[in-house]
C-alpha cells in the first residue's frame, strides 16, 4: 500500500529552544534507517517551510506508524493513496453498478 505522508514542525518555544529542536531533529534523522518493507518513492521539503511530503510504499501500517513516531518534533498525517487510474476504474465500476439498480 502506498501512503502520502505529510509533516509539519510542531511549534517550539523561544528561538534558542527552536534551534536546539532543529539540532535534535537532525541528530535523530541521521541515525534513522529505513526498514526493508518501507520503500520511499518521493521525499521532498516544501520550499521556505519546515515541512514536506513523502510517498512511501509499505505493507505494514504499524511500520508507517513507527516512522511517524520517530520524530516527535513533527506532526504527521499518513494517508493511504491509490493511483488515479485505479481510482477512476473502480469509480466507473461503481457508477455502472448503481446505474444497473432498477428503481421502484
Give residue spans per PLM region:
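Conserved short beta-strand edge segments in small beta-sheet-based binding/regulatory domains
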Residues: 74-86
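Short cationic amphipathic helices and targeting signals
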Residues: 51-56
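A generic structural signal for well-ordered alpha-helical surface patches
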Residues: 62-65, 79
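Conserved catalytic core of Hanks-type protein kinase domains
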Residues: 57-58, 70
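Short amphipathic alpha-helices in soluble, non-transmembrane regions
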Residues: 64-72
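Glycine-centered loop/turn motif at secondary-structure junctions
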Residues: 37, 72-75
Amino acid at each position: 500500500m502506498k501512503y502520502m505522508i505529510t509533516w509539519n514542525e510542531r511549534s517550539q518555544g523561544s528561538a534558542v529552544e527552536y534551534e536546539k529542536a532543529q539540532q535534535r531533529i537532525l541528530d535523530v534523522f541521521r541515525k534513522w534507517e529505513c526498514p526493508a518493507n518501507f520503500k520511499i518513492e518521493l521525499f521532498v521539503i516544501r520550499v521556505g517551510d519546515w515541512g514536506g511530503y513523502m510517498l512511501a510504499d509499505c505493507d505494514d501500517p504499524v511500520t508507517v506508524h513507527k516512522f511517524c513516531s520517530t520524530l516527535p518534533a513533527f506532526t504527521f498525517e499518513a494517508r493511504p493513496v491509490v493511483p488515479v487510474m485505479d481510482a477512476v476504474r473502480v469509480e466507473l465500476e461503481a457508477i455502472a453498478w448503481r446505474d444497473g439498480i432498477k428503481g421502484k
